[in-house]
Amino acid sequence: LVQVLYQKKETEWLGVFHASAVGKNGKCMLFLGDSGNGKSTSLALLQAHGFECIADDFVPVDAHSQEVYKFPAAISIKRNSIPVLLPYYPILEISEEFHLKQLDKHVRYLPPVNELSPNKMPCDGFVFIKYDAKAPFSCTQISSVRAFEKIVPDSWLSPIAANAATFLNWFSKQRCYELIYNDNSEMISEVHKLYSDEL
């Protein structure tokens, strides 16, 4: 689908990441996390506070420019996140719920707000995010080696040698963070700092 959308061959993509691409002020960062870690919920919260959803779950990156491309898919919201998001998205109360049998999940879909964002933008870093009600808040920078170990299992990376070399060079220059939170307001405030280069 992404190849048809942007008229690009598979060889022209650096990779596709299982992440949320979040944009603000011309910057884009990729938020990654295991299922149940709050990745899509945090994306919806950030969208409600001035950030843009560039893509959710399926994030394509161009091999030539290493830019993140917009992907027009809705944000999947799990049942247990509905109460948290209803104050910002009342439409979720009446949205149809779907049962994803293979994953044993019940989800509703939230349209992304990204009409004003460009179709592509440079990546400014990776954030490995996790909601943990029992853990203290922390946001720490991690090495690109540790980050690489985290992204590979859930990503498609081009097997072409030139693209692989480009990816390694590009990824080694990215800022990578691990963000653990138990308070939504604190998480949003910290992400604002990331986009303002205050960390």
Language-model segments: residues:
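Extreme N-terminal, non-catalytic leader segments
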Residues: L1-G26
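Post-Walker A alpha-helix
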Residues: S42-L43
